[in-house]
From Swiss-Prot:
Alphabetically ordered keywords of this record: Proteasome
Gene name linked to the record: PSMD6
Coiled-coil intervals, chain numbering: none
The protein's name: 26S proteasome non-ATPase regulatory subunit 6
Purpose: Component of the 26S proteasome, a multiprotein complex involved in the ATP-dependent degradation of ubiquitinated proteins. This complex plays a key role in the maintenance of protein homeostasis by removing misfolded or damaged proteins, which could impair cellular functions, and by removing proteins whose functions are no longer required. Therefore, the proteasome participates in numerous cellular processes, including cell cycle progression, apoptosis, or DNA damage repair.
């Protein structure tokens, strides 16, 4: 079971993804003037002399730049880079390949820390070419992956994920193999592949050491969120509800625990309240924010489906009471999801009764095939008309 005092087992927090989260918060209208968030972000910028990052930050957030601070940080950057270049030059003249590689790595890490993305990428790639040991090569690839996540550079992430997989197949150790799964899972969250994220996170719950990305409580929270939307009820029970490592952490995360157990225990009104809290948390999370509407909608459908599976018919009033909402709201919700083909039931408006009409899987597949075939045929016909013209 990972513990908070094992945080030193993580790689360096460079770049620090907390900075990306703070920057995201300040981009939201409701947090744009949040002095506490701005102070925390600027403290990190000053402490690390992040001149290149500060310039980009002021431009993206439309801040008035503190020219004196910028010049001070630029001077500190120039002095440190000069020192690092002198160390590299000395290593090239007087020392061996290992020392040269260490000096190159130190410069790359510094460029990464101050937010010089392009400079850091170039320096890490040069260092990679000088690196022989497989483990050290993988550590550089993890740096590139963190840079990719920090700036949400999809191409950088996908290319280096493949490179990391290839290196691990050559003989990467157990720790780095598991670490890569967490990196992949985090990126899967960012691109809305919740099913793959759940699989990767659940594989690493008991072996998590990637504290350079997030603390263990955040990791467990993410794991619960993606598992609830991705897993069927039996899998959720076996892998999450009965997961000793997850349950231990959930004692200190009561809101997340209530969200998980309220759905599993069919306490739907409590679940809807918890889902509203989760929605607000996701809006403020730099990875989940682009997907919060989709996530909340899918979880509502999931809850409605779970209740409807237990009955052949039930009244709108009963459903409204179960979910703690009004009859009009539940009527509109169900009508919308039925029309979209997401819920297999129909509403008897006269008697205010919901009747389930779940198709068997074969029939459903047949109907889907017919529907998609019709759409494809229409597109082919339109294309043929364009070509004939």
């Amino acid at each position: 079971m990972p513990l908070e005092n094992l945080e030193e087992e993580g790689l360096p927090k460079n770049p620090d993804l907390r900075i990306a989260q703070l920057r995201f918060l300040l981009s939201l209208p409701e947090h744009r003037g949040d002095a506490a968030v701005r102070d925390e972000l600027m403290a990190a910028v000053r402490d690390n002399n992040m001149a290149p990052y500060y310039e980009a930050l002021c431009k993206s957030l439309e801040w008035q730049m503190d020219v004196d601070l910028l010049n001070k940080m630029k001077k500190a950057n120039e002095d440190e880079l000069k020192r690092l270049d002198e160390e590299l030059e000395d290593a090239e003249k007087n020392l061996g390949e290992s020392e040269i590689r260490d000096a190159m790595m130190a410069k790359a890490e510094y460029l990464c820390r101050i937010g010089d993305k392009e400079g850091a990428l170039t320096a890490f790639r040069r260092t990679y070419d000088k690196t022989v040991a497989l483990g050290h090569r993988l550590d550089i690839v993890f740096y590139l992956l963190r840079i990719g996540l920090f700036y949400m550079d999809n191409d950088l992430i996908t290319r280096n994920t493949e490179k990391a997989k290839s290196l691990i197949e050559e003989g990467g150790d157990w720790d780095r193999r598991n670490r890569l799964k967490v990196y992949q899972g985090l990126y899967c969250v960012a691109i809305r592949d919740f099913k793959q994220a759940a699989e990767l996170f659940l594989d690493t719950v008991s072996t998590f050491t990637s504290y350079e990305l997030m603390d263990y409580k955040t990791f467990v929270t993410y794991t619960v969120y993606v598992s609830m939307i991705a897993l069927e009820r039996p899998d959720l029970r076996e892998k999450v509800i009965k997961g000793a490592e997850i349950l231990e952490v959930l004692h200190s995360l009561p809101a997340v625990r209530q969200y998980l157990f309220s759905l599993y225990e069919c306490r739907y009104s409590v679940f809807f309240q918890s889902l509203a809290i989760v929605e607000q948390e996701m809006k403020k999370d730099w990875l989940f924010a682009p997907h919060y509407r989709y996530y909340v909608r899918e979880m509502r459908i999931h809850a409605y489906s779970q209740l409807l599976e237990s009955y052949r018919s039930l009244t709108l009033g009963y459903m409204a009471e179960a979910f703690g909402v009004g009859v009009e709201f539940i009527d509109q919700e169900l009508s919308r999801f039925i029309a979209a083909g997401r819920l297999h039931c129909k509403i008897d408006k006269v008697n205010e009764v919901v009747e389930t009409n779940r198709p068997d899987s074969k029939n459903w597949q047949y109907q889907e095939t017919i529907k998609k075939g019709g759409l494809l045929l229409n597109r082919v016909q339109k294309l043929s008309r364009v070509i004939n013209m």
